[in-house]
From Swiss-Prot:
Protein name: Photosystem I reaction center subunit XI
Gene3D superfamilies: Photosystem I PsaL, reaction centre subunit XI (1.20.1240.10)
Residues exposed to the Stromal side: 1-72, 140-150
Residue ranges, Lumenal side: 94-118
Transmembrane stretches, start-end: 73-93, 119-139
Entries under InterPro entries matching the protein: PSI_PsaL, PSI_PsaL_sf, PSI_suXI
Keyword vocabulary terms for this entry: Chloroplast, Membrane, Photosynthesis, Photosystem I, Plastid, Thylakoid, Transmembrane, Transmembrane helix
BP GO annotations: photosynthesis
C-alpha cells in the first residue's frame, strides 16, 4: 500500500498525498475542466458559469424543505429565498475582493480587485438567471414538481 500513496512531488512538507485517485489523468482532466481552473476564461465568464450552477441548485432545497413547503406559494418562496441568498453571497464575495486584493499587478486577472469585481458581477447575473431557469422549469413542467419530497 505504501507504493501507491506517496508525498506529492516527493516533498513530505507540502501536506498533500499523491494517491492513484488524486493523480490520475481522469481526475486531473475533470478538475481542469471546472470553471475555477479552466484556462482562457475571463473572470466575468467564470463567475457567470459558477453562478448559473449555484443558482440552479439553490431553488430546490428552498422549495421542498422551506417553511412554506406545503403551500401553493412554495415554489415562488423558494425562488425568492434563493435570490435572497444569492444577494447575500454576492455581497460577501464583493467584501472578500475588496479586502483581499490591493495590488493590480498580479499575473492572474482574477487575483485583482477589478477582476474579482467582474467575477462577482458574473456570479450575480448567472445565479439569478440559474434560479429563474429552475423556477420556470419547475413551474411549467408538473412532472418535475412532483418528483422528490412531497
Amino acid at each position: 500500500m505504501s507504493d501507491f500513496i506517496q508525498s506529492y512531488n516527493n516533498d513530505p512538507f507540502l501536506g498533500n498525498l499523491s494517491t492513484p485517485v488524486s493523480t490520475s489523468t481522469f481526475t486531473k482532466g475533470l478538475l481542469n475542466n471546472l470553471p475555477a481552473y479552466r484556462r482562457g476564461l475571463s473572470p466575468l465568464l467564470r463567475g457567470l458559469e459558477i453562478g448559473m450552477a449555484h443558482g440552479y441548485f439553490l431553488v430546490g432545497p428552498f422549495d421542498k424543505l422551506g417553511p412554506l413547503r406545503n403551500t401553493d406559494v412554495a415554489l415562488l418562496s423558494g425562488f425568492l429565498s434563493a435570490v435572497g441568498l444569492i444577494i447575500i453571497l454576492t455581497v460577501c464575495l464583493s467584501m472578500y475582493g475588496n479586502v483581499s486584493f490591493d495590488k493590480d499587478d498580479a499575473k492572474d486577472l482574477l487575483q485583482t480587485t477589478e477582476g474579482w469585481g467582474q467575477f462577482t458581477a458574473g456570479f450575480l447575473v448567472g445565479a439569478v438567471g440559474g434560479s429563474g431557469f429552475a423556477y420556470l422549469l419547475l413551474a411549467n413542467i408538473p412532472v418535475l414538481q412532483n418528483l422528490g419530497l412531497s
